[in-house]
Amino acid sequence: MNTETTQDTTEAKLPGERLREARERLGLTQQTIAERLCLKITTVRDIEDGTTPADLAPTFLRGYIRSYAKLVHLPEDNLLPIMDKQAVPKAISVSPMQSFSLKKSRKKRDGWLMIITWLVVLVVLGLTGAWWWQNHQAQQAEINSMVDHASSMQSQTEGQSVPLMDNSAPQETSTAGSAATPPSTPVDLSATIAATPSTPPSSTTASSAAPSSQSPSQANATQSQAAGNALLGAGAVAPAATVADSNPVSAAHALVMTFTADCWLEVTDVSGKKLFSGMQRNGSTLNLDGQSPYQLKIGAPAAVQIKFQGKPVDLSRFVRSSQVARLTLTAE
């Protein structure tokens, strides 16, 4: 009777308690057991306390207990069944099985995302096109208003009467005056001949060689004619010199425009005077000479080639943007 009670009490003890008692009977410490079994002292303590480490698999735990039992001379066949009875089964977490509907819903979500993306792209493209169309319409309206203004100004100019001057009477008076001037003004014949080297020497020699065959009135007429020719020669030389002097000034402000298509144009000089405002046809050339800097407005920059002071003017930036060209040309 006492033997059965002792066996039941022994079996009721946990494997860890039995291992601890056996270790104490042998006079061993936990550190000694850990060193002999090559375990951590915390693992030995958990085995004796009956605590299963969370990071330790049951298979390794059974192996550690078997080695511990052999070390303290306990039958391992009695410890392992007790451990299996008292072990608490772990709850196995089973992941829910994914159905095919999840993949289908993901595809559906991706489809909606693509639709929204394409809608955003289409809205951006539409806004860009609307912005470009508004700018194009504004430019066309501005060009049309400029053309209408130029046409109205041209019609007003054509409607005004321009008086015509009759230059025949002044020419006759001038001719008569020039003819009457030599007799009233004494002219030195020798000085006149010296001032006009273009007069042929033969005529002078012939006139001086035969003085006896001319009357005094004829001699006076000859002298008057020679003096008139000298004055006309001097008058012809003076304007030529004036034109030659004025050419550098004109070249410094010369503006030449050649048109390859119909184009509206407006040119204003530094004083605010409009040198030109209207349409120019294909193949025409416009030469302007005023006071720089010039203010230019060109409706179709691609249809005009500009030279200022003999140098071409670059209009490529206006041609690329298809805008009305507004630029200022300043003399160097």
Swiss-Prot record:
Ranges of residues in domain HTH cro/C1-type? 19-71
Segments passing through the bilayer: 112-132
Q: Does the keyword Zinc apply?
A: no
Subcellular location, record wording: Cell inner membrane
The DNA-binding region ranges are 30-49
> Which GO terms of type biological process are on file?
regulation of cell shape
| Membrane topology field | Single-pass type II membrane protein
Stored SUPFAM superfamilies? lambda repressor-like DNA-binding domains
Give the family, as the similarity comment puts it.
Belongs to the RodZ family.
What is the name of this protein?
Cytoskeleton protein RodZ
Organism this protein belongs to: Pectobacterium atrosepticum (strain SCRI 1043 / ATCC BAA-672) (Erwinia carotovora subsp. atroseptica)
Gene name of this polypeptide: rodZ
